[in-house]
Structures are given as C-alpha cells and as structure tokens.
C-alpha cells in the first residue's frame, strides 16, 4: 500500500488518468451488461421473453423460377403460417411501427412512435393501464379510429391521464378517439415500446384480400410443456404446406 501511495505522489497526473480510465472502463462494461439484460431477460412489460418465438420479416418468391422476390409478410401470409400452431398459447400480429406527426390538434404536435397491434398484443405484453380501457373486439373488427396513448403524451396534451379519455388525438392529421392511457414504456423494450397504440385494422379494412407482401410480424407465446424448438419446428411445417 505504501508503494502504491508513493507511486501516486511521484506521478499524480498519470495515476489520475489510470484510475479514471479504469473506472470508466468498468462503468462502460456494467452499462452494456445492464442494457443487454434489460433487452433479453424476462422483465415487465416483456416478462415472458423466454417463452416467446419471434418471426422475421419474411421473404417470398415464385417457386417456379425464384423470381418476383420480396421481403415482408402481409397479414394474409402471417396469419396462414401462425394461426393454427398447436404449440402456441397465444399469437399476436404486429403491424408496421411508424414515426408519425401526432398531437392534440392538426397544427400542434410532433413525431411520435405509433405501433399497430391486435387484441392479443395486450395479453402477451404486460403494459399497465393508468386510465380508461383497451380498444375492444368490436372496435377492432369495425376499424374504428381509436387509440391508446402513453401517460406522458396524455399529460402533455391534456394535463392528466384521466382528462385524456374520450378526447381526440390526431395521428397523421387524422383524429382518433383516446380510449385508454398506459404507463410509459422504455424504448429499451423492442416489441413493447410505443407512444401510441392503435388497431392495425384501421389502416386497411381489406386485409384478407392482399397478396404475400406486407409489413407484418408475429410473436408466438409457447404453451406450457412445449419447447421453443418444438414450436419452431411446427412453424417450419406450416411454411411447408
């Protein structure tokens, strides 16, 4: 210890640089580990990651000559693959996530993260409601212009979560009625994060008539007693049909 103190007194500048550099390196490694843990561990609102299987964006082409290749799956395609999986407890389809101009009026707003989801999304992810409710089956099926927003947006626009319920909130200059307000979700959660959530059925009421190409993804929750590898095998069999 005396030798260390003597070295520090002899070379205070280099000793300080060495100590600070070591501290910064340790802090950097700890931050990376914390971010990795947050993005991979079973933490709310993505509290069942270890039981989830995620689709990729998909890739389609003509079988005859491999021409007309496209990335991305339509609702029709993703539903055909994931709808009848015996090993899946729940499947949620995620529409495209966009940055859109949003605000409490057409002339007052800013770009926000808008996520398009179905009803099962709220069963797969644990996002607590602060006020109001989630959009209903009837609203989803009827393509109603309803939206669930985060608590921060509600406070900024209307003063409180409770005051936001029933008000109009403009998404891409189109009014949508606020039916619910959730707790804010950190952007570290890849699939649960959003500032606004709306039914993807409001984007296109004729989803079943499209072709293979689109912007949908799927997240499947594995049934108890079924392994993730088994569910992946079922997905591959479904693709082969």
Task: Identify the role of each PLM range.
Residues 118-135, 145-241:
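Mid-to-C-terminal secondary-structure elements
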Residues 11-39:
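Short, strongly hydrophobic transmembrane alpha-helices
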Residues 9-10, 221:
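Alpha-solenoid HEAT/Armadillo repeat architecture
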Residues 3, 10, 17, 110, ...:
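Alpha-helical hydrophobic/aromatic positions enriched in membrane-embedded helices and signal peptides
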Residues 3, 27, 31, 217, ...:
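Amphipathic alpha-helical recognition patches that constitute DNA-binding helices
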Residues 33-157, 163, 171-176, 233:
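Structured, solvent-exposed hinge/loop segments at the ends of secondary-structure elements
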Residues 1-9, 77-81:
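A short amphipathic helical element positioned immediately N-terminal to and/or at the very start
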């Amino acid at each position: 210890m005396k030798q260390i103190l003597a070295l520090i007194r002899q070379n205070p500048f280099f000793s300080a640089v060495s100590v600070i550099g070591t501290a910064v390196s340790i802090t950097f490694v700890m931050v990376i580990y914390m971010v990795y843990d947050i993005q991979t561990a079973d933490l709310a609102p993505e509290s069942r990651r270890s039981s989830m299987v995620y689709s990729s964006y998909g890739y389609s082409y003509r079988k005859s000559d491999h021409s007309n290749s496209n990335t991305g799956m339509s609702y029709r395609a993703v539903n055909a693959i994931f709808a009848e999986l015996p090993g899946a407890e729940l499947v949620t389809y995620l529409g495209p996530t966009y940055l859109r101009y949003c605000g409490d009026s057409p002339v007052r707003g800013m770009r926000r993260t808008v996520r398009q989801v179905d009803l099962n999304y709220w069963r797969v992810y644990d996002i607590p409601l602060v006020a109001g409710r989630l959009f209903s089956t009837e609203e989803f099926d009827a393509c109603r212009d309803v939206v669930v927003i985060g608590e921060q947006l509600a406070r900024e626009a209307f003063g409180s979560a409770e005051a936001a319920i029933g008000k109009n909130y403009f998404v891409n200059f189109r009014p949508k009625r606020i039916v619910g307000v959730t707790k804010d979700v950190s952007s570290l959660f890849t699939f649960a994060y959003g500032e606004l959530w709306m039914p993807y059925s409001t984007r296109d009421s004729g989803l079943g008539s499209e072709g293979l190409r689109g912007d949908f993804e799927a997240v499947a929750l594995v049934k108890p007693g079924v392994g993730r590898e088994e569910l992946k095998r079922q997905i591959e069999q479904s693709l082969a049909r």
